[in-house]
Amino acid sequence: MSNYLDFEKSIKQIDEDIANAKIRGDEHAVEILNKNLSKEISKVYKNLNEYQRLQLARHPDRPYAIDYINSFLVDGYEVHGDRAFRDDPAIVCYIGYIGGKKTVVIGEQKGRGTKNKLKRNFGMPHPEGYRKALRVAKLAEKFNLPILFLIDTPGAYPGVGAEERGQSEAIARNLFEFANLKTPIIAVVIGEGGSGGALAIGVADRLAMMKNSVFSVISPEGCAAILWNDPTKQEQATKSMKITADDLKNLSLIDDVINEPINGAHRDKDGAAKALANYFISELAELEKLDINELVAKRIDKVLSIGAYEE
């Protein structure tokens, strides 16, 4: 792995030692170093703070929506376009099988490498992306297919063109439509859950977060710039904002936390994908026991119960 975070320096050193030992052909040293690596990973990842989890949520090697789709979706094929303006590559929509169950998977895709990041607009959808998601979700409702949302975006794209084409309307429309959609919906934050850009595919019967993901109304850098006029105080902001999976579970804003492999999803993509797929399969089995009208009523009540109010 070529991308290491500042708190992973000790892990990087052992990885380099293992690589050198392999070059020398010293199998005994490799065996010892691998044991040391496992111990060091457990030590480093055992007590991560909020800012370190934010760094992991943004890690360039972290699996994106298409990585998960390629891992556990069988016989999947992609659906394109909103049938009104264009296809938005920042949102991907697939139909395939998870655990033998035909499923619609809709995810936000950031992209890797300069060319692909530009194509995917760094995971920031335009309104046509959200309208594509709604179009495909309506197909899921029509054919009685469950939906899996994979949330991973810094936020909805704030460009002039996006605003002119109704970015806020597209997000609001999705909130309304998904709340009333007559099919089971499970949403999982797999990386960054950035504000309205995440909420637009975040209304679900079950909302979960991968252990090292975040969900917030604004980026910590933006929060620090507003509150302290200093974006470099993002670490302080991250702690204050309560944006980690554990924080949001404690606040009852999400339903579940999906544990990642001990060394993080970026170092064990297959393990992370297996955990996510198993969660979807088990939760879907529970949701399918409910009458569809009861399911929708519970979903609406769930959305309306969010927040603290004083009169």
UniProtKB/Swiss-Prot annotation:
Keywords: ATP-binding, Cytoplasm, Fatty acid biosynthesis, Fatty acid metabolism, Lipid biosynthesis, Lipid metabolism, Nucleotide-binding, Transferase. It comes from the Bacteria. It is an enzyme of class 2 (transferase). It is found in: Cytoplasm. Component of the acetyl coenzyme A carboxylase (ACC) complex. First, biotin carboxylase catalyzes the carboxylation of biotin on its carrier protein (BCCP) and then the CO(2) group is transferred by the carboxyltransferase to acetyl-CoA to form malonyl-CoA. Belongs to the AccA family. This is Acetyl-coenzyme A carboxylase carboxyl transferase subunit alpha. The gene is accA.
